[in-house]
Regions:
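Short cysteine-rich clusters marking metal-coordination/redox-active sites
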Residues: 8-11, 28-31
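A short beta-strand-turn-helix
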Residues: 14, 41-59
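Cys/His-rich microdomains that often coordinate metals
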Residues: 15, 35, 75
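Short Cys/His-rich micro-motifs in 6-15 aa windows
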Residues: 31-40
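Thiol-based oxidoreductase modules, predominantly thioredoxin-like and allied folds used
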Residues: 43, 63, 74-101, 108
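Short pre-active-site segment immediately N-terminal to redox-active cysteine/selenocysteine motifs
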Residues: 56, 63-67, 110
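Non-catalytic, surface beta->alpha helical segment in thiol-disulfide oxidoreductase systems
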Residues: 110, 115-143
């Protein structure tokens, strides 16, 4: 029985979950909320590093901005992808206007940009809006 570390999307506590329990709707040991809600996690400067480095599952981050038309168009597709991919993959969003330092750190030049992280390391990136099927296909091809 292997154990996975999963960061809570609500309180950001790290939870140890047996891998066979992932599909059984596990809850956070600290705040008691569901670890997987079927929605992308909103990241901030204080929670970003915790999620990309402490989760044992891959984390896909959508770097976006409120003024970006393609970002707004892709948001529902990204949310649909979260429903399909959880709990094997965590989908998250980072507002580049509010977190300019992180956007600069990862050299985000166009938005939306998706980056797949595993163990804090970037595995792949894709710029431009995509459909839910394209997002799922792209993620599955890299994890």
């Amino acid at each position: 029985m292997s154990t996975l570390h999963i960061v809570c999307s609500h309180c950001h506590a790290v939870n140890r979950i047996p891998s066979e329990r992932l599909a059984q709707h596990p809850r956070c040991g600290k705040c008691k909320e569901a670890l997987f809600s079927g929605h992308p996690v909103e990241l901030t400067g204080s929670s970003f590093q915790q999620h990309i480095s402490r989760n044992d599952i891959p984390v896909v981050v959508d770097f976006w901005a409120a003024w970006c038309g393609p970002c707004k168009m892709m948001a529902p597709a990204y949310a649909q992808a979260a429903v399909k991919l959880e709990p094997q993959v965590r989908l998250a969003k980072l507002n580049t206007e509010q977190e300019q330092g992180i956007a600069a750190q990862f050299n985000i030049r166009s938005i939306p940009t998706l980056i797949i992280f595993k163990g804090g390391v970037e595995l792949a990136r894709q710029a431009g809006a995509m459909s839910a099927a394209d997002i799922i296909g792209w993620i599955n091809s890299h994890v």
